[in-house]
Amino acid sequence: MLSSKKIIIAAGGTKSGKTTFLNAILAEISKLKDRVILIEDTPELQCSAEDCVQMRATTSFSMDDCLKQVLRMTPDRIVVGEVRSGEALALLDAWSTGHGGGCSTVHSNNARDTLTRLENMTARVSRNPQQATIAQAVNIIVYLKYAGNTRKVQEIVELEEWDPAAMKYRFHSLN
């Protein structure tokens, strides 16, 4: 999955293991010799790739600003620690311009809800619905859950397309 440069979203609630999962993905990506651009506002991710550029979003240089700069840095993979707001649209656009293999985290209640959360985040900066953009950019959603002091992968889905006639996403389970 990583060598085929699928875009992966690690989704789940607080303490579900999203960041730990992303760090495991980064450990594997680091073996591939790709240029990784890592963007975070809170430093939590570790990337041992030989060619890793880390960017920090701040109050004066936003996540959106970082994403606008990243395309000039010839990234092989764009990784964002956590998507929370309107920067989701800039990230989806970056992933949709030939920069596959990226990953990020999103807080959500299940894999399908992750898509709704992305729609809501992009709606903060665009009046146009972004379902087709989401379906073009995102390939895999890994939903993690924390229950009873354990963290586990509860669901893995592959997003196939946005069907405008049916007004729904088409995806299948990889569990």
Predicted regions and their residues:
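Switch/coupling sub-region of P-loop NTPases
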Residues: 2-15, 20, 24-137, 143-147
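Conserved P-loop NTPase
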Residues: 135-175
